[in-house]
């Protein structure tokens, strides 16, 4: 979410940044909405102020026994009382119109981000390792897994449809080992706090990290009818004063729906643990002495992949359900850039220990995510992909500035005592399913078996090679 005051102060800079994103200028239309919003709010505030003043004057007139003046003032108050709800509604509608318009606009790129229109404008930052030489033609993971009998797409299709997989025996254990290894490194060495978050979240959480409203079609959601008792339970939780700050709770809004026998609530399956982890600080004022906060989670993730029709239809590269280790940092504005570099190095470290060849790309303005100011992609080498192998994304590490914090109302208080918005960062540390693919294709042997990387041996119960039936 953008700061309308910043747009007001420098509309040309805002439009110039949007141009780098490939978007038309928007400052004029936003400022026009803002002007109407401010006028509506001012009119509402002036009406309230006049009503308060007139009410006080009524008492003074009656005290002075000026009945005519008292009657005139009472008529004025009655008229204001009649017109004010409409004025308040107009102010609220104008505010919501601006909020909706701002919510549709992506974050602005940092100055050092390269300009470009798509992935062809990305710049290679650095490379780790080298491509391995094989005395045979490397096979893709789906062929390896199928021959082992441990990767079953047909059974998954019967259960759930396309873009799902059933893993068994050695491959199921190998995927579990990879995820556990990633978590152990990030929590034990990199200082991240492990979190086991809900996999279902509400609209506000998805809005906070900017999956909504723009990317609703890429998500899985469902509607649940909540009974009166369920609604009451939720209302009681939200009334708890430890969770409610002044100005953030509308009793009428909470109680009115209870008159209905049921209410439809929508929940979303998380597309990434970034959503619950980042929203842990929503509607909070943190002590800056506690920052940075670093969270990590190993979770299933769910994506509809609405725009991926026809792409990566074979194998596990693009699934509706996949496992990922997520890294999230909450920082001050002064430290977010350094934290971004640190997060990248943490994601790289687990791949280095697996001895996987990869490259790091700095994404251009046309290829960055909606909420990102700057993104590094880690692309791991998969020797069985395409003709002769291919680099495939296994991690994206992004710094978002205060873009998500404004949507979540997440702030911190520094030495001067004034609250300000925190900066948020997120990255994959890394995608476990794609790491499994990279390990399978990199460590495959001529007989179709897969050697287990040394760092994963402690997690494999003595299994050193995954072969058919093991």
Curated annotation (Swiss-Prot):
A GO cellular component annotation in the UniProt record: cytoplasm
Binding site for ATP: 303-305, 393-396
Family to which the UniProt record says this protein belongs: Belongs to the class-II aminoacyl-tRNA synthetase family. Type-1 seryl-tRNA synthetase subfamily.
Enzyme class: ligase
Domain of life of the native organism: Bacteria
Keyword flag Methyltransferase: no
Protein name: Serine--tRNA ligase
InterPro entries: aa-tRNA-synt_IIb (IPR002314), aa-tRNA-synth_II (IPR006195), aa-tRNA-synth_II/BPL/LPL (IPR045864), Ser-tRNA-ligase_type_1 (IPR002317), Ser-tRNA-synth_1_N (IPR015866), SerRS_1_N_sf (IPR042103), SerRS_core (IPR033729), tRNA-bd_arm (IPR010978)
Cellular localisation: Cytoplasm
Biological or metabolic pathway of the protein: Aminoacyl-tRNA biosynthesis; selenocysteinyl-tRNA(Sec) biosynthesis; L-seryl-tRNA(Sec) from L-serine and tRNA(Sec): step 1/1
GO biological process: selenocysteine biosynthetic process; seryl-tRNA aminoacylation
HAMAP family: Ser_tRNA_synth_type1 (MF_00176)
Catalytic activity entry: tRNA(Ser) + L-serine + ATP = L-seryl-tRNA(Ser) + AMP + diphosphate + H(+); tRNA(Sec) + L-serine + ATP = L-seryl-tRNA(Sec) + AMP + diphosphate + H(+)
Keyword set, alphabetical order: Aminoacyl-tRNA synthetase, ATP-binding, Cytoplasm, Ligase, Nucleotide-binding, Protein biosynthesis
């Amino acid at each position: 979410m953008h700061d309308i005051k910043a747009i007001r102060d420098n509309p040309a800079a805002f439009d110039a940044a949007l141009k780098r994103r490939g978007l038309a200028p928007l400052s004029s239309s936003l400022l026009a909405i803002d002007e109407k919003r401010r006028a509506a709010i001012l009119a509402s505030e002036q009406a309230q102020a006049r009503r308060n003043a007139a009410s006080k004057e009524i008492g003074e007139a009656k005290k002075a026994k000026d009945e005519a003046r008292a009657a005139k003032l009472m008529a004025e108050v009655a008229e204001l009382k009649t017109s004010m709800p409409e004025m308040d509604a107009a102010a609220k509608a104008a505010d919501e119109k601006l909020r909706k318009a701002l919510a549709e606009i992506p974050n602005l790129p940092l100055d050092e981000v390269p300009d470009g229109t798509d992935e062809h404008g990305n710049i290679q930052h650095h490379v780790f390792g080298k491509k391995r030489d094989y005395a045979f033609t490397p096979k893709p993971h789906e062929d390896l897994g199928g021959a082992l009998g441990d990767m079953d797409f047909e059974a998954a299709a019967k259960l759930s449809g396309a873009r799902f997989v059933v893993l068994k025996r050695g491959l199921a254990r190998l995927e579990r080992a990879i995820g556990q290894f990633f978590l152990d490194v990030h929590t034990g060495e990199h200082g991240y706090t492990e979190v086991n978050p809900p996999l279902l979240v509400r609209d506000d959480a998805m809005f906070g990290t900017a999956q909504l409203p723009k990317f609703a079609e890429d998500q899985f959601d469902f509607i649940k009818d909540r009974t009166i008792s369920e609604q009451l339970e939720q209302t009681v939780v939200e009334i708890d004063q430890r969770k409610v700050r002044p100005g953030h709770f509308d009793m009428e809004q909470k109680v009115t729906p209870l008159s209905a026998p049921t209410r439809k609530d929508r929940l979303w399956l998380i597309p990434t643990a970034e959503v619950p982890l980042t929203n842990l600080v929503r509607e909070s004022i943190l002590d800056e002495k506690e920052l940075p906060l670093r969270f990590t989670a190993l979770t299933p993730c769910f994506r509809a992949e609405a725009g991926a029709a026809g792409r990566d239809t074979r194998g596990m590269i693009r699934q509706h359900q996949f496992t990922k280790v997520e890294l999230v940092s909450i920082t001050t504005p002064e430290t977010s850039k350094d934290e971004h570099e640190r997060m990248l190095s943490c994601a790289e470290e687990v791949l280095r220990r697996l001895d996987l060849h990869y490259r790091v790309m700095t994404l251009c303005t046309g290829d960055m995510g909606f909420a990102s100011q700057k993104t590094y992609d880690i692309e791991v080498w998969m020797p069985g992909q395409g003709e002769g192998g291919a680099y495939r994304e296994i991690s994206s590490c992004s710094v978002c500035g205060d873009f998500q914090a404004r949507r979540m109302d997440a702030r911190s208080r520094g030495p001067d005592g004034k609250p300000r918005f925190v900066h948020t960062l997120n990255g994959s540390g890394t995608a476990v399913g794609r790491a499994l693919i990279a390990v399978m294709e990199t460590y495959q042997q001529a007989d179709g078996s897969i050697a287990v990387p040394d760092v994963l041996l402690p997690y494999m119960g003595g299994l050193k090679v995954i072969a058919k039936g093991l």
